C-alpha cells in the first residue's frame, strides 16, 4: 500500500471515530472484573473492553516507570486519562521486586519526592495515582532480570531461569499481588511476557511446558487474590495460540481467564491485502473468538512507528486496526513512553519510536496514531 492508500485507509477507519466523551463513559468500569464467555464484565455485570497502554520501566535497568525524569507523575497520568483509555499494562521484573533497589536520581528528576526512594515505593505511587484517576492496572511479569525484551538469548525466554527459578516466580507473584490486594483498580495479572520458541504448550518436558506452568502460576495468584483476571500468553512471543482450544487453561476459579496475544509486523511483511492479514491472524489466535467455552482475548501488545510513515509496518498497522475493530478486540498499545529506558540495545532518554507521548511526556507525539486508536475505543 502506498502513502496515498495509507491516507485513504486512515480516513476510512476514522469514520468510526469515538468522541472523548463516549470513551470516558467506557473508562469508568466498576472493578473487580470477571469473565463470562468471551466477555469481561464488571461488578455490575456490564461488559468492559480493556483499552490500555503499556507503561514500561519497572522492568528495565533504571527500575522505574519511564518519564518520571521529564514530567511530574500527575502530568503523565493526566495524559493517559486524556487519551481515553481505561487501563495500563504495567510491566515489572522479578529483579525489581526482589532486590527493590534505590532508584537513580536521574530517572526521577522531575519528581523530587522519589529521590532516595526504592523501586517498589515508586511503583506504589504510580499504582495509586492511576487508581485515583480510575485507570485500571494489569501487572505484567515482563522479565526475570531487568532488561529490554526480547531475544532468544536474553535469559528471560521462559517463566524462570537459574537465578530466578519457578519457585521464586510463584512467590514473587503472590508477593506483588498481596501488595496491591486492597487496591481494587489493580484488576489483572499477566503471568509472563512473550514466552520464546523453546516453550511448549503441553508436551512431555515439564521444564518447557508453559500450559502446566501457567495453571500453577494462575492458581498461585488467585490464592493471593481471587478477584484478579489472569492473562495468559502463548509460546512464540505470544503470537501462536494453536492448540489452546484442545488444551485449555483451567484455574481453580473458572471466571478469571483471559488469553493475551501480541501482534507486531517485526519482519515488515508486506501483506498484499486485508483478507491475507485476516487469514493469518485468525489462524494464530482469532479462531479462539469462535470456540466454546469462550475465553476473552486481550491484545496485550501491538504497535508501530509513531509517525505512521514506516512503509509495510504502517500499512500492516492500519489493517490490524481494522481487524481489531471487526472482532471487537480489547487491546493494550505498546507504549505510552516518550523516551527509552536503559537496557540492551537501548539508549537512555533517546526517543521511543513507538511512543504515544512526546519526549517531555506533556503532550501527544503521535496524533494520527492516537486518532486510529480512538476508533477502537468503543
Q: Which functions belong to the PLM regions below?
A:
Residues 1-10:
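Bacterial N-terminal signal peptides that target proteins for export
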Amino acid at each position: 500500500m502506498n502513502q496515498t492508500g495509507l491516507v485513504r485507509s486512515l480516513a476510512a477507519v476514522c469514520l468510526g471515530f469515538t468522541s472523548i466523551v463516549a470513551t470516558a463513559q467506557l473508562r469508568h468500569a466498576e472493578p473487580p472484573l470477571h469473565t463470562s464467555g468471551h466477555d469481561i464484565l464488571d461488578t455490575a455485570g456490564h461488559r468492559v473492553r480493556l483499552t490500555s497502554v503499556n507503561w514500561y520501566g519497572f522492568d528495565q535497568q533504571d527500575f522505574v516507570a519511564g518519564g518520571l525524569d521529564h514530567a511530574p507523575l500527575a502530568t503523565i497520568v493526566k495524559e493517559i486519562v486524556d487519551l481515553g483509555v481505561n487501563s495500563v499494562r504495567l510491566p515489572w521484573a522479578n529483579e525489581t521486586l526482589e532486590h527493590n533497589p534505590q532508584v537513580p536520581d536521574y530517572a526521577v528528576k522531575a519528581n523530587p519526592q522519589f529521590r532516595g526512594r526504592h523501586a517498589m515505593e515508586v511503583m506504589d505511587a504510580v499504582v495509586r495515582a492511576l487508581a485515583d484517576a480510575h485507570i485500571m492496572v494489569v501487572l505484567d511479569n515482563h522479565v526475570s532480570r531487568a532488561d529490554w525484551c526480547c531475544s532468544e538469548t536474553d535469559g528471560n525466554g521462559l517463566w524462570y531461569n537459574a537465578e530466578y527459578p519457578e519457585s521464586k516466580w510463584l512467590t514473587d507473584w503472590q508477593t506483588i499481588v498481596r501488595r496491591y490486594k486492597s487496591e481494587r483498580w489493580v484488576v489483572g495479572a499477566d503471568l509472563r511476557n512473550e514466552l520464546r520458541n523453546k516453550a511448549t504448550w503441553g508436551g512431555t518436558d515439564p521444564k518447557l511446558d508453559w500450559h502446566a506452568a501457567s495453571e500453577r502460576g494462575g492458581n498461585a495468584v488467585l490464592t493471593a487474590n481471587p478477584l484478579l483476571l489472569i492473562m495468559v500468553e502463548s509460546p512464540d512471543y505470544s503470537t501462536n495460540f494453536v492448540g489452546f482450544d484442545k488444551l485449555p487453561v483451567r484455574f481453580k476459579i473458572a471466571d478469571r481467564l483471559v488469553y493475551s496475544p501480541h501482534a507486531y509486523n517485526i519482519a515488515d511483511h508486506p501483506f498484499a491485502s486485508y483478507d491475507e492479514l485476516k487469514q493469518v491472524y485468525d489462524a494464530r489466535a482469532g479462531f479462539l473468538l469462535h470456540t466454546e467455552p469462550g475465553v476473552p482475548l486481550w491484545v496485550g501488545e501491538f504497535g508501530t512507528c509513531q509517525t505512521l510513515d514506516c512503509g509495510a509496518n504502517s500499512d500492516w498497522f492500519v489493517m490490524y486496526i481494522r481487524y481489531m475493530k471487526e472482532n471487537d478486540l480489547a487491546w493494550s498499545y505498546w507504549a505510552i513512553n516518550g523516551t527509552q529506558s536503559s537496557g540492551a540495545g537501548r539508549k537512555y532518554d533517546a526517543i521511543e519510536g513507538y511512543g504515544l507521548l512526546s519526549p517531555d511526556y506533556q503532550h501527544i507525539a503521535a496524533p494520527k496514531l492516537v486518532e486510529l486508536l480512538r476508533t477502537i475505543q468503543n
